[in-house]
Amino acid sequence: MSGAPPSYSFVALPPRAKDGLVVFGKNSARPRDEVQEVVYFPAVDHDAESKVECTYISIDQVPRTHAIVISRPAWLWGAEMGANEHGVCIANEAINAREPAAETEALLGMDLVRLGLERGTTAKEALDIIVSLLDEHGQGGNYYEDAHSCHSFQSAYLLVDRDEAWVLETVGKYWAAERITEGVRCICNHLSLATKLDEEHPELRTYAQSQGWWTGDDEFNFAQVFSPADDRLDCCAGQDSLEKQEESITVQTMINILRDKASGVCIDSESFLTTASIVSVLPQNRSSPCIHYFTGTPDPSRSIFKPFIFVDDVKLVPKAQSPCFGDDDPAKKEPRFQEKPDRRHELYKAHEWARAVIESDEEQGRTLRKTMLELEKQGLEAMDEILSSPEPPDPAEVGDLFYDCVDTEMKFFK
Amino acid sequence: MDEEYDVIVLGTGLTECILSGIMSVNGKKVLHMDRNPYYGGESSSITPLEELYKRFQILEGPPESMGRGRDWNVDLIPKFLMANGQLVKMLLYTEVTRYLDFKVVEGSFVYKGGKIYKVPSTETEALASNLMGMFEKRRFRKFLVFVANFDENDPKTFEGVDPQNTSMRDVYRKFDLGQDVIDFTGHALALYRTDDYLDQPCLETINRIKLYSESLARYGKSPYLYPLYGLGELPQGFARLSAIYGGTYMLNKPVDDIIMENGKVVGVKSEGEVARCKQLICDPSYIPDRVQKAGQVIRIICILSHPIKNTNDANSCQIIIPQNQVNRKSDIYVCMISYAHNVAAQGKYIAIASTTVETAEPEKEVEPALELLEPIDQKFVAISDLYEPIDDGSESQVFCSCSYDATTHFETTCNDIKDIYKRMAGSAFDFENMKRKQNDVFGEADQ
């Protein structure tokens, strides 16, 4: 069993988060050479009886899917994290549990993130959709684009909307969930649910008893029952980072946490890299828009967060999307992953130049870094104005917002 | 003297020297006189430095820290050349640049909220600048694309704007530009000194913004050029042009009287002799009874031992203080040049603050500019009257130039030249009029 990738997902709710804004963030840790893309899908009506091709399996499509914007490894169908037009954000975490994850191809955790976003109008509704699909189709399959080994994991999810957050942790088809209405919460690559369970699979406890993991006599503690024997249950660098913030949590706070390598929240190791990040701000006041910031490039400490706002005519951003190989994609053929095509998008390639400069040329690197942070700051300031404004933003003005920011960023990368 | 000329020119300011050159190239017999022993008049560069102190009656003269007096060439009128502007066109057509060297001014800055911001000179500089917020920048970019594409002869480029009727205020409104962006556009790009242009038809403003962009594109960095050894080189260059086409120059020649007969000029008397002419060109100082005062300009020449703060140690720059940043009607300008242009001793900088006078306390009016320049080693304060001619010369055939205004470029000067030319020659000025002819006396014709 290989170690689960050390991703971190965060939520802060008012009043712990500032100004009536729910703040959500995730660092996605994945294999170093993997490219993540940022993709927008508009809302679509679907034919009755139609199917949707997820990463490995095909399932029934619903009549209508919501507009979504997601960050995902370019080879798979689902998402590591993302948001929908209704202000729902979802992130997943790969987890090792006592019970090995199925290698049989089914739905990946990433597929369920996307399906939850496409179908749920609230965090709770998305949770119900995910557990229903889990029950119907199960979870399983390779999490990595690797022909030689199957890396499979159980999945946990952080689901957030303007009002509340839910932590959902799943083992096979069994699951437990906790509702969060205040304070801060982080989930990482360990089970974290303990005795406070607001929802659970109806057979969760009987299953645990039947496996001999729970006697039925003591209080049911989900993480204790389902974690591998050698897991250190109380360890979460992200939760520590979040809790020790003395000021109210803002978007900038969240960004700073995601950039922090000393705490281990930002990963740059031999096997894993934080390959993409997201921060979302969800105003409890519904007349303000939700704003979602994506990097689209590896390592948030060397990337900038760029804003996205849902409106009816969002401009597509080809430069942050990887090339599409259609049915010829080695990820779609069996046996899987016999080749590894170049999945780098234009922004990724431009950013490679910037990363090389930052690493090799101290003076030029520092100047470039400073310029990019200044650009990011201007974006954050503009978004703060939108959130402070009594009127919603002009859709014509924000439809090409993410497109423009990607385009601008690339102009600074030779 | 005691000869007959087509045109007599009095005063060797830039305007007069350019007109002298044009007239000579076009076959007129020209006599050019100046009461001073040097070229330039109001637009001269003062050298050595001791002369500047004397001129401003600072009796102790320059301290030793100023270095060799001969290293200094201090302009009395602070201006830069716009790289795609009319004066550069005149220089190129006349090939006067053959005798001159220019440097690109390193930057232009605009004052906002007590600080100065670089006027961006590249796209990435504009994107990185915090002179505007993100959404303002995006609207502004759309506006600039509109201006760049605008062609007054192609209605398809108009986007619903009427160049002769739509006011500039309405164009700004169409692009939803905020007040800060409007100030920046009108004062740092279109280089208007006041806000009167807002209610005028937009064509002139669009053309001015185009001029700025085209000048900027010429050399990068900034849209301005400056001649080594100072602006005084310019009138001399044009005077040389006039001379090689047969123009006669007399410096250090007092003008005792301008002789009129039946309301028409017939000659000039100097030291007892009379030179006769059909037409006369002069600057306002030669005909005080035929000009009227049109305001005042204050210019404060400051010598510094440091670049101006927040200009990235620029050796040369312009700073524009838009008038409503300091509750005035007219902008305040700062032009800074330095030893790098062979106009000052090593390590020294010359910054000149100027504006149109609006109150009885003009020095107080330029204080926001002087604060940007501190510490100042030495200040020279000049308050000049602005004159314009009373008559257009149609009867008198006396054509008087206007005084130099407070702008930091020569476009108004060139407009004055074109206007005088039209009144003298009876036809619109064409830059082709300045092209060298085959018959120049030194055989320097282009083949």
UniProtKB/Swiss-Prot annotation, chain A:
One of its GO terms (molecular function) is cysteine-type exopeptidase activity. It comes from the Eukaryota. GO terms for cellular component: cytoplasm; nuclear membrane; presynapse. Keywords: Cytoplasm, Exocytosis. It is found in: Cytoplasm. GO terms for biological process: exocytosis; proteolysis; regulation of synaptic vesicle cycle. Signal peptide: none annotated. 'Secern' is an archaic English term meaning 'secrete'. Regulates exocytosis in mast cells. Increases both the extent of secretion and the sensitivity of mast cells to stimulation with calcium. Belongs to the peptidase C69 family. Secernin subfamily. This is Secernin-1. The gene is Scrn1.
UniProtKB/Swiss-Prot annotation, chain B:
It holds the Pfam family GDI. GO terms for cellular component: axon; endoplasmic reticulum; Golgi apparatus; midbody; myelin sheath; neuronal cell body; presynaptic cytosol; protein-containing complex. InterPro entries: FAD/NAD-bd_sf, GDP_dissociation_inhibitor, RabGDI. GO terms for biological process: negative regulation of axonogenesis; negative regulation of protein targeting to membrane; positive regulation of axon extension; positive regulation of toll-like receptor signaling pathway; protein transport; Rab protein signal transduction; response to calcium ion. One of its GO terms (molecular function) is GTPase activator activity. The modification Phosphoserine is found at S427. It comes from the Eukaryota. It is found in: Cytoplasm; Golgi apparatus, trans-Golgi network. High expression in brain, lower in other tissues. Keywords: Cytoplasm, Golgi apparatus, GTPase activation, Phosphoprotein. Regulates the GDP/GTP exchange reaction of most Rab proteins by inhibiting the dissociation of GDP from them, and the subsequent binding of GTP to them. Promotes the dissociation of GDP-bound Rab proteins from the membrane and inhibits their activation. Promotes the dissociation of RAB1A, RAB3A, RAB5A and RAB10 from membranes. Interacts with RHOH. Interacts with the non-phosphorylated forms of RAB1A, RAB3A, RAB5A, RAB5B, RAB5C, RAB8A, RAB8B, RAB12, RAB35, and RAB43. Interacts with RAB10. Belongs to the Rab GDI family. This is Rab GDP dissociation inhibitor alpha.
